[in-house]
Structures are given as C-alpha cells and as structure tokens.
Regions:
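Beta-strand-rich domains and repeat architectures in extracellular enzymes and scaffolds
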Residues: 40-79
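Short, Lys/Arg-rich N-terminal segment immediately upstream of the first membrane anchor
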Residues: 1-5
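A short helix->beta-strand "capping" segment at the edge of beta-propeller domains
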Residues: 26-47, 86-95
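Hydrophobic membrane-insertion alpha-helices, especially the h-region
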Residues: 6-22
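Asp-box/WD-like beta-propeller blade repeats and closely related beta-sheet repeat scaffolds
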Residues: 99-177, 181-182
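Beta-propeller blade signature
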Residues: 78-87, 131-138, 185
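Blade-loop segments of beta-propeller domains
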Residues: 49-50, 68, 74-123
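Alpha-helical membrane-targeting segments
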Residues: 20, 27, 178-185
Length: 185
C-alpha cells in the first residue's frame, strides 16, 4: 500500500471517529424512559405552550403559548400570555394579551415582583424581527410598558429578569436560515 493511501485511510478513519463521537456525545443513540410517578391534575389546552413561570408567593402561573407553524414562518404567528390561578382547582387560563395590538408570538418568559406589581418580560418572535416585550401585571390585567429591540437579540429563546430593568437572555442560534442554520439544528 502506498504512503498516500495510508494517509487517506487514516484521515477517513479519523473523520468517522469524529462523526461517531458527535453522535454519541449528543445522545443520539440514547433511549429516554418515561418514569413519571406523579399524577396529572388537569390537562389544559393551550396551542404550542412554550414556557411557564410560577409565582409561588401568589400561587399563579404565567404561560406563553403560540400556535407554532413550520420554520421559517411564512405568516405571522399569533400567541399569547395566559394567567392560571393555582389556588382555583379549575385551572382556567385567562388570556392576558388578547388586547395587545402588536404581532405577538411569545417564547421564553420571566416575572419579577416589586411591591404588589409583577413585571413580565416575554421574548417575541415576529416577521419584522425579534423583540423583548415588557408588561406589568396588576390584578390579572396586563399593561404593556415597552418593547426592546437590539442587534444582540437575533435568535432569542429564554429570558430571566433580575429586577424590573435588568435581565439575561439567551440566543439559541447564530444563523437565521440556510445550511448553517440547518447544521445548528
């Protein structure tokens, strides 16, 4: 066997080992077993529920929900934020953003309480870009405070409020479309 063939075979073997390592390390061949031993209190029908955050102090949950279409979106998706009173065993969701006039497809959400007022931050995916919407929750009603747009917010996924004016957020992709986005997924 010639020297060039040996080098070629070595490169192919290394490449195959690298690809195998990617599949193994990312859990591609792993089997997940459902071991849930709890009970479901009630199924709540919300299309495309994405995130939930709970106020343990005041016993309620806020759920972000958007009927998800295929990616990339061909039309603006419509979603909402929902309030669920955890003290009321009916667990009826109240649509908090039904009167919000902007396109709204929420993703990650976070809440922060100051006094008796909750600030809610929601990632918003629209056809015109990615935004973070800020609301105040007072007596089960939302008031829109502001919209934040920034070049660093290009593929936001989740957010956590540190206070009513400070937060962390994550971008879950570097690329919006094309082969690079496919490779990231």
């Amino acid at each position: 066997m010639t020297f060039k063939k040996r080098i070629l075979y070595a490169v192919i073997i290394l490449l195959l080992l690298y690809v195998a390592n990617i599949f193994i390390s990312t859990g591609y061949f792993r089997t997940i077993t459902n071991n849930f031993e709890g009970s479901i209190l009630q199924k709540i029908k919300l299309p495309g529920a994405e995130d939930i955050t709970i106020s343990q102090i005041d016993s309620f949950a806020i759920v972000s929900s958007t009927k998800r279409n295929k990616f990339p979106n061909k039309t603006q998706e419509t979603g909402g934020l929902y309030f669920i009173d955890l003290k009321n065993k009916a667990y009826q969701p109240i649509h908090l953003t039904k009167n919000f006039k902007k396109p709204f497809a929420p993703h990650g959400i976070s809440i922060f309480k100051t006094g008796s007022v909750y600030t809610i931050a929601a990632i918003n995916h629209t056809e015109k870009g990615e935004f973070i919407e800020f609301f105040q929750l007072i007596n089960k009603k939302l008031k829109h405070i502001k919209t934040l747009k920034n070049e660093l917010i290009f593929s936001p996924n989740d957010i956590v409020l540190l206070d009513e004016n400070s937060f962390y957020f994550t971008n879950d992709h570097k690329y919006k479309q094309g082969i690079q986005r496919l490779a990231e997924d």
